[in-house]
């Protein structure tokens, strides 16, 4: 059985669902003519129960934050507003943070060898939002469906691109025809592979450990990040007073830490954080995922485009992965819209414009994150002194500091006008 569509988006994560909703919101395709295809599409779930560590069960009672959280920029917030996602997010699972403090192992938080960003200095209400991962996923699926996207649960088996269109064979025997296919199926994208697009990159030989902790001192609506020789530790503020940790460390250290009991792990976080928030109590299990740098050598083919992790996977140290992917969606929609209603959605010209814009922006971001990881993981004493001096210099140069903050907010850079936030 064959079904004819305008666009097929492969991947039903936040990036894929936002891509579909945005195409419909911008009137680039008609309701019922855009499909989101994935082997499994999550259905919105009732409020979750987080399995607490037994010794900390009482402390974890309350808002059931998902273990995975996202740090979203102002530009991402604006894009989610346009797609109808933002207003549907549960308020108690979205938390605005007002400050960010970054410091080197040899320095102190808010002191020597540290760098602090404050929303008040930028004239902004906040620096961004910490958002529950499952809540965001659920609402993005809802928004895509509400906008008129067809949700299809099936694995993609083959992609055949011709001058006239794209034929997509599904594992259940169905076939889809479209003018454009968009791969949003993650770093291990099957669609990218079927399109014959190669990737490059390297592994960091690191894992990212994630968990939620309760701290003796209030987080003060601040995202804290300390750079250690084995990788950075971030403490991200949650609405219930707890913090979500993202600890990037070597594979060997990751195995050691995951083998610790809750008290031992909490003690390790306390030491690694330099005691910035006082005593630590672990309130959830600890999960982990491997870290690598990967980028597609091409973002587009005739009648095909990559967005999100299918195009680029970066180090999580600055929490920019999803923000970059959402900007891909906005930029692709902008390029398709600039081509005019008469142009075919699969025309190569608009797709190449998208590639030129986002490839350079994403390369800058990936190179910067890779460079930071290498710089702060070096144990060379000379480089350590350079790091501390560099953080201090950036902190004293207000125009440099402001420029970095504005870029992270999505206020600066090659950002589509319809999502570009403007400072008050």
Question: Where are the language model's segments positioned?
Answer:
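Conserved FAD-binding catalytic core of PHBH/FMO-like flavoproteins
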Residues: 80, 167, 180-286
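N-terminal FAD cofactor-binding segment of flavoenzymes
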Residues: 62-107
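Conserved Rossmann-like nucleotide-cofactor binding loop
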Residues: 15, 42-43, 157, 188
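C-terminal helical "tail/cap" subdomain of flavin- and related membrane-associated enzymes
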Residues: 334-424
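Beta1/beta-strand and adjacent pyrophosphate-binding region of the FAD-binding site
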Residues: 2-15
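FAD/FMN-dependent oxidoreductases across multiple families
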Residues: 255-348
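Conserved N-terminal helical subregion
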Residues: 92-194, 201-207
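Glycine-rich FAD pyrophosphate-binding loop
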Residues: 10, 24-67
């Amino acid at each position: 059985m064959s079904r004819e569509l305008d666009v097929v988006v492969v991947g039903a994560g936040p990036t894929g669902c936002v891509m579909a909703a945005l195409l419909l919101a911008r009137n680039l395709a008609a309701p019922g003519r855009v499909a989101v295809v994935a082997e499994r599409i999550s259905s919105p779930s009732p409020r979750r129960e987080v399995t607490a560590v037994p010794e900390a069960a009482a402390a974890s009672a309350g808002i059931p934050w998902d273990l995975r959280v996202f740090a979203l920029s102002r530009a991402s917030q604006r894009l989610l507003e346009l797609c109808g996602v933002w207003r549907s997010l549960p308020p108690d699972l979205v938390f605005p943070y007002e400050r960010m403090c970054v410091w080197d192992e040899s320095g102190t938080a808010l002191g020597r060898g540290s760098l602090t960003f404050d929303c008040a200095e930028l004239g902004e209400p906040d620096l961004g939002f910490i958002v529950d991962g499952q809540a965001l996923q659920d609402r993005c699926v809802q928004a895509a469906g509400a906008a008129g996207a067809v949700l299809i649960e099936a694995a993609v088996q083959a992609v055949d691109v011709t001058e006239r269109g794209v034929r997509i064979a599904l594992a259940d025997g169905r076939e889809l025809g479209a003018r454009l296919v968009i791969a949003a199926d993650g770093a291990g994208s099957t669609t990218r592979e079927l399109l014959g697009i190669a990737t490059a990159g390297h592994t960091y030989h690191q894992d990212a450990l994630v968990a939620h902790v309760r701290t003796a001192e209030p987080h003060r609506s601040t995202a804290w990040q300390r750079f250690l020789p084995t990788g950075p530790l971030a403490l991200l503020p949650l609405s219930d007073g707890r913090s979500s940790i993202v600890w990037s460390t070597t594979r060997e250290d990751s195995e050691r830490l995951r083998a610790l009991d809750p008290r031992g792990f909490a003690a390790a976080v306390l030491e690694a954080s330099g005691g910035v928030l006082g005593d630590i109590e672990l309130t959830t299990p600890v999960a982990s995922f491997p870290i690598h740098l990967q980028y597609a050598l091409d973002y587009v083919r005739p009648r095909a485009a990559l967005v999100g992790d299918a195009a680029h996977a970066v180090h999580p140290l600055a929490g920019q992965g999803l923000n970059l992917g959402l900007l891909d969606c906005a930029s692709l929609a902008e390029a398709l819209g600039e081509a005019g209603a008469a142009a075919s959605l699969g025309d190569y010209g608009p797709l190449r414009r998208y590639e030129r814009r986002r490839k350079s922006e994403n390369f800058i971001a990936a190179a910067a994150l890779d460079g930071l990881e290498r710089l702060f993981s070096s144990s060379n004493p000379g480089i350590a002194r350079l790091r501390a001096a560099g953080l201090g210099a950036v902190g004293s140069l207000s125009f440099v500091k402001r420029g970095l903050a504005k870029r992270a907010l999505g206020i600066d850079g090659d950002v589509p006008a319809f999502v570009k936030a403007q400072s008050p």
